From Swiss-Prot:
Signal peptide: none annotated. This is Tryptophan synthase alpha chain. It comes from Streptococcus thermophilus (strain CNRZ 1066). InterPro entries: Aldolase_TIM (IPR013785), RibuloseP-bd_barrel (IPR011060), Trp_synthase_alpha_AS (IPR018204), Trp_synthase_suA (IPR002028). HAMAP family: Trp_synth_alpha. The keyword Lyase applies. The active site is at 52 (proton acceptor), 63 (proton acceptor). Belongs to the TrpA family. Pathway: Amino-acid biosynthesis; L-tryptophan biosynthesis; L-tryptophan from chorismate: step 5/5.
Length: 260
């Protein structure tokens, strides 16, 4: 069974538009979790393909300083994974949601219960950056009969054989990491990045999205030329926190309506 997220993003790719997925931190809002759907609606109205929702955690190994601070603000409001899932169960969204979390919160929640409860939301994808592919059986047996795709991350340092292993049988999309290190770094791209992304996109049979360090309209243009779209996190999180909703809407509209 082809999962909803795969079909949804593939349809956008087939329409010759760039896929655009913004990242937000759940609970990082003046209203806490009560403002979550306000932010989601703002992004939906700007035409996004899907929305990545971050789960705050005390040791976010893949997060750069902007997203880490957002997580700390959310944790200070006593936002938990349980509370986030309950909030997401209240209302269906127009576009698929993708949860980005770490192993420990899922383990503490209970893996089977986590997948079961997510199935009652609009979440169609799951990213766990500290879950090695060798240990994916931690959760894949529970996802197999669900409509939730486990999204693999592929970095520049990933060897060809390893890339093929990650890509084969992957669902949802391939998360291509544009820089070595944490989210939010900009301008530190390797010279062979475009070639790496082009090769990855040519080999994969599901959409390839470029993330980590993507923050400008020029980045959107560049990475849409060598992959199927982009994920933007730190810029969105920072601008939302600074109250720049109009600026966010304009930027997201540009990325969401980019024609190939």
């Amino acid at each position: 069974m082809t999962k909803t997220l795969t079909k949804h993003l593939q349809a956008i790719k087939d329409s010759k538009r760039g896929i655009f997925v913004p990242y937000i931190m759940a609970g990082d809002h003046a209203k806490g979790l009560d403002g979550l759907f306000e932010t989601i609606t703002l992004l939906e109205n700007s035409g996004v393909s899907a929305i990545e929702v971050g789960i705050p955690w005390s040791d976010p190994v893949a997060d750069g300083p902007i997203i880490e601070l957002a997580g700390q603000r959310s944790l200070a409001k006593d936002v938990t994974l349980t509370a986030i899932i309950k909030k997401l169960q209240e209302k269906k969204t127009q576009v698929p949601l993708v949860i980005m979390t770490y192993i420990n919160p899922v383990y503490e929640y209970g893996i089977e219960a986590f997948v079961k409860d997510l199935a009652e939301t609009s979440v169609k994808g799951l990213i766990i950056p500290d879950l090695p592919n060798e240990h994916a059986d931690f959760i894949t047996p529970y996802l197999r009969d669900s409509d939730i795709a486990l999204v693999p991350l592929v970095s520049l340092t990933t060897g060809i054989d390893r890339q093929k292993q990650l890509i084969n049988g992957a669902e949802g999309f391939i998360y291509a990491v544009a820089i070595n290190g944490v989210t939010g770094k900009t301008g530190n791209y390797r010279d062979d990045l475009d070639k790496h992304l082009s090769n990855l996109t040519a080999y994969a049979d599901i959409p390839v999205l470029t993330g980590f360090g993507v923050s400008t309209e020029e980045d959107i243009k560049r990475f849409n030329a060598v992959s199927d779209g982009v994920i933007v996190g730190s810029k969105i999180v920072r601008d939302l926190h600074d109250g720049k909703e109009e600026e966010v809407a304009e930027f997201v509209t540009f990325g969401s309506h980019f024609e190939k």
